[in-house]
Regions:
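ATPase catalytic-site recognition across NTP-hydrolyzing enzymes
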Residues: 1-32
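Acidic two-metal-ion nuclease catalytic site recognized across multiple nuclease folds
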Residues: 3, 9-10, 170-187
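Active-site-proximal flexible loops/turns
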Residues: 33, 95, 169-172
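Structural motif
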Residues: 34-35, 121, 157-163
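Short, flexible loop/turn motifs enriched in small residues
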Residues: 34-42
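Mg2+-dependent endonuclease catalytic cores in nucleic-acid-processing enzymes, primarily RNase H-like
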Residues: 42-44, 49-155
Length: 187
């Protein structure tokens, strides 16, 4: 779904303050264990400006639920006040409880919401993939860039898809906001 050459790496991003930004979290809660390869918790910060998506930051860790919660809280403090924070709401009561816990106890005072996913991971990644192919995704060059691109190129057959999931969630959320602002006239 992705090719390495589709990613445009940039050292600086234009007008970050003017961007609509979403930090989307894909949760996991398993600490790193020798001999195992558990999923990562990933928080992808994506901006949108003038028809282009900018991958501005990736927070990625393997940790206990307490370590994950602390990273999410610290990242919210680090991000701009206008960043919308989203998190995938897993099905069932546990998903509802997780979102409620974060809304009341961890991210109170921030723009936060849970997002129910629908469709397969590949379906949810289509907008991200298409935008990359068209040259409409810019990636800030950073220590996390190589791991991100490697994971994308291996998707959906790679051992991990957490960064793809988080970025897809952010891009889909930003796309939903853009669609709300468009006015359609039917003749």
């Amino acid at each position: 779904m992705f090719e390495e050459g589709w990613f445009d790496l940039v050292l600086e991003t234009p007008d970050v303050d003017k961007m609509k930004k979403v930090r989307f979290w894909d949760l996991a809660a398993t600490a790193e264990v020798k001999g195992k390869n558990p999923d990562y918790t990933v928080g992808a910060l994506v901006g949108f400006l003038e028809g282009r998506y900018y991958i501005l930051d990736i927070q990625r860790l393997r940790g206990t639920p307490g370590e994950v919660q602390l990273r999410i809280e610290m990242t919210a403090e680090m991000d701009d006040d206008g960043v919308q924070i989203c998190m995938e709401q897993e099905p069932g009561a546990s998903g509802v409880n997780t979102i409620d816990h974060y809304a009341r106890n961890v991210l109170a005072g921030y723009i936060f919401k849970g997002v129910k996913s629908s469709g397969s991971k590949q379906e949810r990644a289509r907008v991200f993939s298409s935008a990359c192919e068209m040259g409409n995704v810019k990636v800030r060059r950073d220590r996390w860039t190589k791991a991100l691109i490697d994971e994308c190129v291996q998707f959906p057959k790679g051992s991990h898809d957490d960064q793809v999931d988080a970025i897809s969630g952010a891009i889909n959320q930003l796309g939903a906001e853009v669609k709300k602002k468009k006015v359609r006239i039917i003749l």
